[in-house]
Amino acid sequence: MIYFVFVVLMGLVVGLMAVASNPAPYFAALGLVFSAVVGCGFLVGYGGSFLSLVLFLIYLGGMLVVFAYSAALAAEPYPESWGSWSVFLYILVYLFGFLLVGYYCYGWWYDFYWMSLDVFGEMSVLSGDVSGVPMVYSSGGFLLLVTGWVLLLALFVVLEITRGLSRGALRAV
């Protein structure tokens, strides 16, 4: 289990370095999706399967709006990819910073103890995160609908803002 968590956390670091080091929004969005997947995999490793599914859907909804906005504003015919030298230098700087912080925190890293959600419920039928689902749909159902509506509205607002004087992404039929 510890190897799974280690690999997932290293994947999260690699994905975040891919987001931070790339100037083109197309490849940065791919790194952001990868980071969201491995971050939710980290939550699954600690027993939060439903929570990771909900967060993954929220991440994808928010990233759709951000990607539409950034791709419409920064449309480049030849974007820089992960193979260019400037991106490679940024990755080396971020990797050096990560190793420096890891070396600094190595002495007291194991003073904290992380527990799974299922540690205290050995005889429970439900896992730790699934027991909160009825609260989301009973008292938080209206807020869930409002959140979905706001995400859809934000997508249309971004598409209209980036349209400008040209025809843009939303075309009148």
From Swiss-Prot:
Record has Oxidoreductase as a keyword: no
EC number annotated for this UniProt entry: 7.1.1.2
Its membrane topology: Multi-pass membrane protein
Transmembrane segments: 1-21, 27-47, 53-73, 82-102, 106-126, 141-161
GO cellular component: mitochondrial membrane
Function of the protein: Core subunit of the mitochondrial membrane respiratory chain NADH dehydrogenase (Complex I) that is believed to belong to the minimal assembly required for catalysis. Complex I functions in the transfer of electrons from NADH to the respiratory chain. The immediate electron acceptor for the enzyme is believed to be ubiquinone.
Organism whose genome encodes this protein: Latimeria chalumnae (Coelacanth)
InterPro entries given in the database record: ComplexI_Subunit6 (IPR050269), NADH_UbQ/plastoQ_OxRdtase_su6 (IPR001457), Nuo/plastoQ_OxRdtase_6_NuoJ (IPR042106)
Designated name of the protein: NADH-ubiquinone oxidoreductase chain 6
Record bears the keyword Transmembrane helix: yes
Keywords for this protein: Electron transport, Membrane, Mitochondrion, NAD, Respiratory chain, Translocase, Transmembrane, Transmembrane helix, Transport, Ubiquinone
Enzymatic reactions: a ubiquinone + NADH + 5 H(+)(in) = a ubiquinol + NAD(+) + 4 H(+)(out)
Sample GO molecular function, one term: NADH dehydrogenase (ubiquinone) activity
